[in-house]
Amino acid sequence: VNNYMVQLISVRTPAEASKEFTKILNKNNSIIGNREPLVKEVDLGDRGKFYRVNIPGFASLEAANAFCSELKENGQDCLVVKVQQ
């Protein structure tokens, strides 16, 4: 069971999510490899809608943290999030 994912960015439009993920992938291809992004729309009420770009598929918190640490060492901010079942 994949209980964790790594959030890379949170932006205002699906187009921006796609564009920014392409930039992140180009810079971090050796880390991200062929992992597919998952874009989640989140409505934050007064703050509006955001599109969060995540890399899913981590079975453990440790695996997600290790992946995020690699990204951070390469200059990419990220956040480990638990998948809501």
Which role fits each region the language model picked out?
Residues 1-4, 30:
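Long, low-complexity, acidic/serine-threonine-proline-glutamine-glycine-rich intrinsically disordered tracts
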Residues 6-8, 53:
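A short beta-strand micro-motif
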Residues 13-85:
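Extracytoplasmic
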